[in-house]
């Protein structure tokens, strides 16, 4: 296990985290890297594009059928996908029942004990990032993931989630070896998105690893349950994911301890970039609209 890179992709739900991570890993495996993916999202969609299949059975659901995790064999939970990538989904309980994070803890312990981490160059955790609760923070807290990549966009909630995740990393950075590898911006075509992503990365004492342009080919590939790397290997978008993979690969040991900012500082940043309006601006716009309405009514 010498030189094993344990990385994690965090990000708010719906940001394209699983798509980004699977395309990046598909590009890495093309470089001859051996990879294990551990899905830590209750949606269990972290391996779908690598397996070209519907969501795979999760460790928790298989354990429930078998009686307990101890009754499982590694072969039952580990599936082999694109170019030999090993895939596992930890899963979660029914909505509203229990802690989804517990599935993450159970899975990682089971995989380690059964030798799933042997003979791989990368272990990649794909983690829900809206809530950095104990279970979802497990890969950080237990010093499993050493490099965290935050998938975000120029939308306010994605920036807010990125800052929150940075707080989670900072909490465990001194007790463990976890570092922020950088931000990955999934373009949503919002105003000044690249500038904003670079500015946030700088404020967090990090770097913008890559700006992934928006391209409908990603959706076309997803409908066929494939990564862009597999579906359209010669496309410009596949080239973007290869660039991202190259940057992640070259980023070993370059992670930083993040410097998260306050909510007020984040809002000020959005105001400075003209993304958010002050109350005065909003009131002035409202007054102008009302005046225009009143003038129109008098005509």
From Swiss-Prot:
Key words, A-Z: 4Fe-4S, ADP-ribosylation, ATP-binding, Iron, Iron-sulfur, Metal-binding, Nitrogen fixation, Nucleotide-binding, Oxidoreductase
Biological processes, Gene Ontology terms: nitrogen fixation
SUPFAM superfamilies: P-loop containing nucleoside triphosphate hydrolases
PROSITE patterns reported in the protein's UniProt record: NIFH_FRXC_1, NIFH_FRXC_2, NIFH_FRXC_3
Pfam families according to UniProt: Fer4_NifH
Molecular functions (GO terms): 4 iron, 4 sulfur cluster binding; ATP binding; metal ion binding; nitrogenase activity
Intrachain S-S bonds: none
Highest taxon, organism lineage: Bacteria
Function in brief: The key enzymatic reactions in nitrogen fixation are catalyzed by the nitrogenase complex, which has 2 components: the iron protein and the molybdenum-iron protein.
Subunit structure, interactors included: Homodimer.
Name of the featured protein: Nitrogenase iron protein
Lineage, broadest ranks: Bacteria, Pseudomonadati, Pseudomonadota, Alphaproteobacteria, Hyphomicrobiales
């Amino acid at each position: 296990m010498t030189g094993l890179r344990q990385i994690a992709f965090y990000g708010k739900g719906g940001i394209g985290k699983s798509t980004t991570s699977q395309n990046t890993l598909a590009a890495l495996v093309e470089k001859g890297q051996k990879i294990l993916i551990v899905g830590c999202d209750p949606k269990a969609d972290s391996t779908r594009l690598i397996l070209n299949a519907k969501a795979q059975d999760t460790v928790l659901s298989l354990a429930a059928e078998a009686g307990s995790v101890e009754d499982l064999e590694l072969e039952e939970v580990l599936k082999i996908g694109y170019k030999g990538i090993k895939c596992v989904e930890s899963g979660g309980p029914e909505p509203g029942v229990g802690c989804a994070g517990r599935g993450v803890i159970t899975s990682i312990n089971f995989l380690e004990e059964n030798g799933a981490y042997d003979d791989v160059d990368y272990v990649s955790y794909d983690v829900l990032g809206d809530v950095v609760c104990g279970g979802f923070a497990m890969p950080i807290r237990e010093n499993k993931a050493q490099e965290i990549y935050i998938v975000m966009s120029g939308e306010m909630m994605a920036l807010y989630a990125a800052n929150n995740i940075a707080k989670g990393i900072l909490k465990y950075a001194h007790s463990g070896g976890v570092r922020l590898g950088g931000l990955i911006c999934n373009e949503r075509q919002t105003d000044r998105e690249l500038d904003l992503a670079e500015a946030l990365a700088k404020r967090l004492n990090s770097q913008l690893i890559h700006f992934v342009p928006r391209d409908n080919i990603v959706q076309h590939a997803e409908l066929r349950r494939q990564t862009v790397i597999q579906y359209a290997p010669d496309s410009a978008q596949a080239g973007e994911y290869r660039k991202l993979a190259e940057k992640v690969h070259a980023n070993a040991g370059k992670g930083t301890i993040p410097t998260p900012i306050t909510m007020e500082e984040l809002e000020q940043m959005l105001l400075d970039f003209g993304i958010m309006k002050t109350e005065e601006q909003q009131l002035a716009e409202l007054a102008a609209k009302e005046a225009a309405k009143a003038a129109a009514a008098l005509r």
